[in-house]
Amino acid sequence: MMNNLFSVFDPSTSSNFNLNWLSLFILMTIAPFSFWASSSLFLISWKSLLKKFFQEISNNIKLSKMKNCLIISSIFIFILLSNVMGLLPYVFTSSSHLVFTMFLAFPFWMTFILFSLINKFNMVMAHLVPMGSPMALSFFMVIIETVSNIIRPITLSVRLTANMISGHLLIHLLSSISMFSNLLFMVSIPFMMILLILETAVAFIQGFVFVILISLYINES
């Protein structure tokens, strides 16, 4: 059993290099496999899943902003593959680090904010005070709305990171307990299988939630 539970999230492989981050480049070889792989049940299921996802995103985005669907779908695939790859043995979980999730969330948020301020400045200022708010509370409403807009990339990043960390910690704890005896090892096997299935579902759900929130932010811009 490891002395530090969070050592599994350490990207360092030596004192000078963080080679674990190179696992992100594996996605470049996995993602375009449909261009050279022959049709199979897995490939057909994968394409059907992406088609359903693209339709869901299209329903949440205004017609004038449909050109953003492609980049949102790409972000979803990237996050999903990163989350699922982190469940494999000896593979570094990049999505469990804030530096990774902030790298995805902050540019989107900053782009939408700048676009709205440049093209729809009056509308942005008007949205800081919800319709029907008393005049006496308008100052506080502006502060609340401003803070809520500022923390959006933080909430996006922390939500994804926290869910990935919690799931991997549970898997690590359960696998560490199973090392004490053969009986615990046999008992923990079905629980480990169930937990891995749940974590796979969480990997999909968290990637979906991430891009759905981004699509909602696009509609507001």
Swiss-Prot record:
Where in or outside the cell it occurs: the entry states: Mitochondrion inner membrane
One annotated GO molecular function is: proton-transporting ATP synthase activity, rotational mechanism
Residue intervals passing through the bilayer: 24-44, 69-89, 98-118, 124-144, 169-189, 194-214
Q: What is its main location?
A: mitochondrion
Gene3D superfamilies assigned: ATP synthase, F0 complex, subunit A
> Which PANTHER family did the record assign?
ATP SYNTHASE SUBUNIT A (PTHR11410:SF0)
How does this chain assemble?
F-type ATPases have 2 components, CF(1) - the catalytic core - and CF(0) - the membrane proton channel. CF(1) has five subunits: alpha(3), beta(3), gamma(1), delta(1), epsilon(1). CF(0) has three main subunits: a, b and c.
Q: What is this protein called?
A: ATP synthase subunit a
